[in-house]
Swiss-Prot record:
This is Multicopy suppressor of sporulation protein msa1. Residues 36-45, 277-292 have a biased composition (Polar residues). Residues 30-68, 237-292 are annotated as: Disordered. The keyword Repressor applies. Gene3D superfamilies: 3.30.70.330. Disulfide bonds: none annotated. Negative regulator of sexual differentiation. Acts by repressing the transcription of meiosis-inducing, ste11-regulated genes. PANTHER family: SERINE/ARGININE RICH SPLICING FACTOR (PTHR23147). The gene is msa1.
Amino acid sequence: MVVSSPSVSLLHSPVEKLSAQLEKTTLLQDIPPGSLSENDNSTTFIKPPLETASSSTPIPSSSSSGVLNPSSVRGKPVACLFVASLNSSRSEEELTATVKDYFQQWGPLLHVKVLKDWLQRPYSFVQFQNTDDASKALSEAQNTILDGRHIRIERAKVNRTIRISSAPHQPYITKKDIDNLLEPYGEVEDVTEIPDQSAFLVRFVYRDEAIAAYTALKHSAWPVLWAENVTYQNGHYKKKGSSPFSPPNAHSRRRKSQGKDQSNTPVIKAPAPIPFSVSSDPPSTMGRSNSAVQSPSYFAHSLVNSTEFSTPNESLSSLPSILPSIPSLESGKAELPTDGSFEQPGYPMNPSMMFAAMPPPIDPYSIFVGQLDPVNCTHYLLVDLFSKYGKVIDCKIIHQSKKPAFAFLRFDSQQAAYAAVCGKTRSPHQKKPLRVEFRQLRPMQQFSPQYQYPSYPYPMFPAPFSPPRNAMMPIPAPMDQFSTFHQSMATLPPGAVPTSIPQSYYPIYSPEMAMPQSYSPMYYTHNPPMDGN
């Protein structure tokens, strides 16, 4: 099936061409399901969620869930506080009520959530309606007594920043290009330029808008990465957590005290650590995991991750292509400034990508639903609850002994799965709020290459000594009786293997040697001794 697209021959700006490709994706939204065959070369695209991610989401009233002010106002992440050291002897309902009554004195609240970690220690997230009220509560309620315990308060770590850089051999991207590129996806809180890398750090107001922008632009002409909430000021990176909104940590106070005691001692400054870590893949909206760094750009498959209050962690496979490649962009080397405006950064430019953690893959058609009541939750109730977002074609419920059940649901479209993840799904039959996120797949679950490689992770080799993929493939059968192969020798892709090898030729490489990715084995001649010599 062929879908006509606007001509890009008269467009001169890379952003205009990318906008034309974005318009092309909207033409596929009216195609009925099933009209695209498996052999069709066209791609199913996700329309940028203009209303779902940026519009106000009404919050239903529910005393058990801690919602205090049912209105259409969306709570900003900067107005959300993390409260720890709560009394573990009280139930979640009692803690929700006490935390609600305690923090209402600083301002109106939108909701309060009480959760427990793996050690059954309770903690809470308090969402204020106003940022000033949250800042005031953070400074005044710190280390105060609630239910007989000194509580600890921090700013909730809601990561919502992406990094956009200039494409190779393309003109430098400008702030105007960033504004035009990200305008459809939601409100941007801050745009910070990184002059020494020709890139921008873009922090959205809401996390789901950052995920929507990353997902839609991942396969565009601009390299897009997931980043931490940082700012770039006076040539230095500054994490968002070190702003006046959050209290200083003990490490900074210890460094200050040590500096006073050793003021006469010369200090040797070591290179600063990497200011922020990025990931080549986005998270889903509700998961929980740790930080991740960028995966190598030369990997054969793109990888994707997710967290609710942090950056993604584990390795994941790619989503379907969101945007087609744009081969018609002008090719040309970008001009470097000659006025000396480029200063050498005071930190290592990039960590070794060979040891970079990779975020996990997600299935854009399926969702994970956690914290289900094992007694009241049934297959019929779960399908009926999520059918408002789209047609549910599969549902599997997994019951655990003495633990909440969980389920996997598969929709007939990506838009339905995205709406289910972003929606505030609540059930009257559930005692706890549901945990809804995209289904995470195993690292190699979506990979089906022509040649299966062993599951050796690349980080097991140092960066300068990483063997190519063709050095870890199955051992081939001898091509003739005179050919001898090293035990770790692997077959080469079709077309790279010679039809015949001269007799008495041997390969001379092994996986321990340093070889480029496009390595072709070399041979040397070995003359066997003649009989009688």
